[in-house]
Every structure is written in structure tokens, then in C-alpha cells.
């Protein structure tokens, strides 16, 4: 398919969870019904369902597509010779783990071939849990892809991306994210020479905004800052490979048309993007460090009320003003399981070893917290207002244990000396108050 210039002006629709509608040509959207006998433009009506028909209306996600060829027009899928190597779970390992950034490959590698499986909570056929990947790429996709296994949350760390989807175009860059519904066909084009980032595949309930509770009606990620594409299509009869991820395996078929042939659509099962720089950060103006749940951007609810299947949490630039307080994130043992990445700058709990493009994993009850250098500085610091700037760390937090993949445990990026950052914690105890 053609590579679309980054200078092309993209238009978006604003809002979260809306019943959106868009058409690239007049009369693409039928009036008063979803599936007319004869569409005025000769298009096929196709429903794209992200939930069961009988879920509560507030949970229902579906979109009606009006396209040149129905998605059913394809030949038999064949299992691909090239699969994602090393994605099977490695040996059980309760240790705290940290990885250096993965290098951009030298050989031509597109977004799909560049997926690196790091950890997963469960088998893909279970309608819960998450899988975590890194991606590295140096060439645009010349094929289309969709995942039958889950919703994708894409977090760029290096390089801008244009994501061509059935419902339109999304441009994202580092400090922005994109969410792609389960089953949505897309193609990732590079707007720079290379790209690297993180990917969370959500096998459970679709991501949504967290409840605000006593915070009130505003704050955290605001609905109006989420952007959904407008209809865009290509009418092409050039053959194109379509790859799907099904139960963790890659299968492909050959299309005799473009899968990006949706001329109009309406519904709420849609892709979207969000600029993390627009997050309205909440924090203390008195004392102590609040729980990190105040930094939640998106959440997928789990089976236990109040315990998320996945929370997407960020640690953005912010002011630290707490009085008489140890200001870094405190030492912690947690029921939840925490995968962290760093998009930009430095993380305020780790002075060394955690670099942009790197990652860490602290599973259930793994003791963690600020490293020795950070703790010493925080205890001795003069407590005046301080701004943490030029930073963006994030966390995928899940109620299920994340099993590292065999590749994640065997790769050279794994830091074998991670535990050493807590080795020389000073003994400051005294029986007489200071």
C-alpha cells in the first residue's frame, strides 16, 4: 500500500465512548437504519462487535461499517512459518527483573516482525489478563494485521507512527498512546527512520476511564482529549497479505482488495489516541505520597470488584510539595503485579539503571522501592517545592501474575545485577529519637 506523508493533515473526532459517525463520501451512511437492502453507493453493511449482543447497554461496543468488499471475502488462513520466537512462559521466577532498552534491528523489520514478547498473565483463549510486548521496527508494514486475542494499547518511546485502520488514520508520537479494538484491521507506517515502544494486549474487558470518586467531575484524563479518526478509505484491487494473531499464533491469508475500504461508519467500537501531556495530575498539597492509583489513565475492570484486570498508569511531570515527607514512591510490597517502562527522562524512584526504552517487572509481593542513591538523597533533601520535569514513566498494573517469557529471561538485555541497587541501604536506626 502507499506510504502516506506525515504532512497530510489529519482530522479527528473528540470524546471518549461516544457514538461516533463519519463518512468519507456523501450518502455512505444510511439514514434511519443500519442494513439497507440496497446501499446508495453499492457498499456492504458489516457490524463489528466488541462485546456480546446481550451485555448491558452501558458496556456494549459495536460499530457499523459500510465497505466496498465485506471482510468475509478472503481465502483460507494458513499458519505462518515465522512465529514470535520465545513467547512461551519461562521458568517460574519470583525475582525482581529489569531490562535495558532493546536495540533497533539492522535487518529490515516491520512492526509485526519487531514484536518482542516479554510477559503474559494467562493463555490467550481466556477472556481476562494481559500480554506485554516491546516493539522495534525500521520499515513500514506492507501488509495488514489484526489481533483476535485482545485490545492493543500502543505506547511509543522512539519514532512517530501512522496507524492506518479500517476506520481512519491515527498519527502518534512519543508521549502519546493509541488504543486499537480487538479485531480491528490496521497497518503501521513509520514516519521516522525507526521506532521503538511498548505494547499491552488486553484480553479482558475493554479499557475505559477510571471512576473519579471524591476527585469530582474533572481530572486525570479528560474525555474531550481523546481523539478518534474520521472515515478514510482506499479503493484498491492490489493483492495484500492479511495477518491475524489467534491464540498467540500468526496466520495469514491473501486479499484481492484493500482491507481499508470502509467509506463510512458509526458506532463506539473504535480506535483512539491520547496525548499523555494533557493528563491532569493529582497530588498531595499537605503531606505523604498518595497511592499511585491517582495516576490512572485507563482501566480494564477485573472479576474482583475494585481490582483491575489492567490499569494503565503514568508518572508525568509534576510538582512535589509534601511537607515532612519522604517524597519518592515509598517502599512497597503489593498484591498487584507491576510492569514499568520509561518513555522519556528519568524515574524519580530510580537514580540509575532504568533508562528510556527499558522495563522492569515486580510481581505479586516482590519488595521494591527507591534505590539506595535515591533514598539517601530524599532523606537528606531540603523540603522546598520541587518540580519533577522532563519525565514520563508508565506502569501496566494487573491483578494477575505476569509470567516472563522464555525470551525475556534469556535475552542479553536482562540486568542480572538489578538487586544490587538495594544492597547497600544504610542502617540509620537508633533507639534514641533524633
From Swiss-Prot:
Its EC number is 1.13.11.5. The active site is at 289 (proton acceptor). Its cofactor is Fe cation. The keyword Membrane does not apply. GO terms for molecular function: homogentisate 1,2-dioxygenase activity; iron ion binding. It catalyses: homogentisate + O2 = 4-maleylacetoacetate + H(+). CDD domains: cupin_HGO_N. The keyword Oxidoreductase applies. Keywords: Dioxygenase, Iron, Metal-binding, Oxidoreductase, Phenylalanine catabolism, Tyrosine catabolism. Signal peptide: none annotated. Homogentisate binds at residues 347, 368. Pathway: Amino-acid degradation; L-phenylalanine degradation; acetoacetate and fumarate from L-phenylalanine: step 4/6. GO terms for biological process: L-phenylalanine catabolic process; tyrosine catabolic process. One of its GO terms (cellular component) is cytoplasm. It is an enzyme of class 1 (oxidoreductase). InterPro entries: HgmA_C, HgmA_N, Homogentis_dOase, Homogentis_dOase_bac, RmlC-like_jellyroll, RmlC_Cupin_sf. Fe cation binds at residues 332, 338, 368. Hexamer; dimer of trimers. Belongs to the homogentisate dioxygenase family. NCBIfam families: hmgA. Involved in the catabolism of homogentisate (2,5-dihydroxyphenylacetate or 2,5-OH-PhAc), a central intermediate in the degradation of phenylalanine and tyrosine. Catalyzes the oxidative ring cleavage of the aromatic ring of homogentisate to yield maleylacetoacetate. This is Homogentisate 1,2-dioxygenase. It comes from Pseudomonas syringae pv. syringae (strain B728a).
Amino acid at each position: 500500500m502507499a506510504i502516506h506523508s506525515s504532512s497530510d493533515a489529519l482530522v479527528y473526532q473528540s470524546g471518549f465512548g461516544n457514538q461516533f459517525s463519519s463518512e468519507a463520501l456523501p450518502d455512505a451512511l444510511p439514514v434511519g437504519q443500519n442494513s439497507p437492502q440496497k446501499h446508495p453507493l453499492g457498499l456492504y453493511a458489516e457490524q463489528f462487535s466488541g462485546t456480546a449482543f446481550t451485555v448491558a447497554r452501558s458496556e456494549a461496543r459495536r460499530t457499523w461499517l459500510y465497505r466496498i468488499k465485506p471482510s468475509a471475502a478472503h481465502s483460507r488462513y494458513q499458519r505462518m512459518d515465522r512465529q514470535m520466537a520465545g513467547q512461551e512462559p519461562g521458568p517460574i521466577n519470583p525475582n525482581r527483573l529489569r531490562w535495558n532498552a532493546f536495540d533497533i534491528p539492522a535487518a529490515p523489520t516491520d512492526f509485526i516482525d519487531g514484536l518482542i514478547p516479554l510477559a503474559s498473565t494467562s493463555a490467550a483463549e481466556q477472556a481476562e489478563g494481559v500480554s506485554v510486548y516491546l516493539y522495534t521496527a525500521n520499515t513500514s508494514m506492507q501488509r495488514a494485521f489484526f489481533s483476535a486475542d485482545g485490545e492493543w494499547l500502543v505506547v511509543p518511546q522512539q519514532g512517530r507512527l501512522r496507524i492506518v485502520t479500517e476506520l481512519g488514520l491515527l498519527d502518534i508520537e512519543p508521549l502519546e498512546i493509541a488504543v486499537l479494538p480487538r479485531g480491528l484491521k490496521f497497518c503501521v507506517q513509520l514516519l521516522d527512520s525507526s521506532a521503538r515502544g511498548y505494547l499491552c494486549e488486553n484480553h479482558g474487558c475493554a479499557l475505559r476511564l477510571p471512576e473519579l470518586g471524591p476527585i469530582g467531575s474533572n481530572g486525570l484524563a479528560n474525555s474531550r482529549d481523546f481523539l478518534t479518526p474520521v472515515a478514510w478509505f482506499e479503493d484498491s484491487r492490489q493483492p495484500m497479505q492479511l495477518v491475524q494473531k489467534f491464540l498467540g499464533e500468526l496466520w495469514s491469508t491473501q486479499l484481492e482488495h484493500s482491507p481499508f475500504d470502509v467509506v463510512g461508519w458509526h458506532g463506539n467500537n473504535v480506535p483512539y489516541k491520547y496525548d499523555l501531556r494533557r493528563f491532569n495530575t493529582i497530588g498531595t498539597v499537605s503531606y505523604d505520597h498518595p497511592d499511585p492509583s491517582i495516576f490512572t489513565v485507563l482501566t480494564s475492570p477485573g472479576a474482583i470488584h475494585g481490582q483491575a484486570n489492567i490499569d494503565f498508569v503514568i508518572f508525568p511531570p509534576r510538582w512535589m510539595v509534601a511537607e515532612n515527607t519522604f517524597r519518592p514512591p515509598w517502599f512497597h510490597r503489593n498484591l498487584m503485579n507491576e510492569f514499568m517502562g520509561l518513555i522519556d527522562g528519568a524515574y524519580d524512584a530510580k537514580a540509575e539503571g532504568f533508562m528510556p526504552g527499558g522495563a522492569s517487572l515486580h510481581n505479586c509481593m516482590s519488595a521494591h522501592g527507591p534505590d539506595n542513591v535515591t533514598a539517601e538523597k530524599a532523606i537528606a533533601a531540603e523540603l522546598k517545592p520541587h518540580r519533577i520535569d522532563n519525565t514520563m514513566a508508565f506502569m501496566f498494573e494487573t491483578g494477575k501474575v505476569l509470567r516472563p517469557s522464555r525470551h525475556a529471561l534469556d535475552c542479553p538485555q536482562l540486568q542480572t545485577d538489578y538487586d544490587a541497587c538495594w544492597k547497600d541501604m544504610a542502617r540509620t536506626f537508633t533507639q534514641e529519637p533524633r
